[in-house]
Amino acid sequence: MTEDFLDIHAHFVYGVDDGARSEEQMRAMLDAASENGVTTLFATSHAAPGLERFPQETYARHLESARDYCRAKGYELTLYPGAELLYNPMLRDAARESGLPTLADTDWVLMEYLPQTSAKELETGLEQVAGCGYSILVAHVERYRCLEQRGLLEKLKARYPIACQMNCSTVLEPGGFWQKRRVERWLRKGVIDVIASDTHNTTSRPVKLREAYEKLKADFGEETADRLTGRAGPWKAFRETL
């Protein structure tokens, strides 16, 4: 039975970032996604608009190769374009001049920061990108030290058009005592909107969607697990618009 999971953050397109290194590795990652019950998969290669040129032609060609492979294998796996944007001071200018790569040509962008980013810089990034008309899915929010400040993430969500993504690896292994408490609080209070694999390979950073789903279901209930994997709720509605 297919679980019908959404994986909105993955680095399977080979030859463009620190994800898949070869076509063979990309195919192995697609095999793993299908085996994990993923049916909607986003190709969110790293990009830093304003800082460096993104290899768009290579990305598009290799993404199409991935689609060909999925069709040949008969996978119920739809692949969509996207990017994981690194916030930097030039990002707003890049957005104004040429636009930003979005998730499946919607108004949503997946954006990350450096782990040590300050609360001020994090909010500046949200303000700038939202001010250009984008909705922002903040990648792996558990990484940012400034969000250890209790209640800050909730305030930012109330102020800006953002959603929060957490990695499956964090669901499965939250870390130390205080990190674990924060992760559990966010999940329990509904601060996290969606989980994703952030997969880069099939070894050290694999998919693990099914395993994370089962843990969420055991710890927080099926309704929460379904919402966080795009089987129900806002991200299922998002999928239905694509």
Task: Describe every region a protein language model picked out.
Residues 34, 130, 187-188:
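Non-catalytic positions within long, well-ordered alpha-helices that form the structural scaffold/packing
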Residues 209-242:
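Mid-to-C-terminal alpha-helical segments outside catalytic/metal-binding sites
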Residues 1-75:
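An N-terminally biased module of ancient metal coordination in phosphate/nucleic-acid-related enzymes
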Residues 6-8, 42-44, 80-83, 137-139, ...:
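Active-site neighborhood of phospho(di)ester-bond hydrolases with catalytic His/Asp-centered motifs
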Residues 46, 191-207:
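Short acidic/histidine-rich active-site segments
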Residues 12-23, 109-117, 171:
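Active-site mouth loops of central-metabolism enzymes
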Residues 52-165:
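Extended substrate/RNA-proximal surfaces in nucleic-acid metabolism proteins
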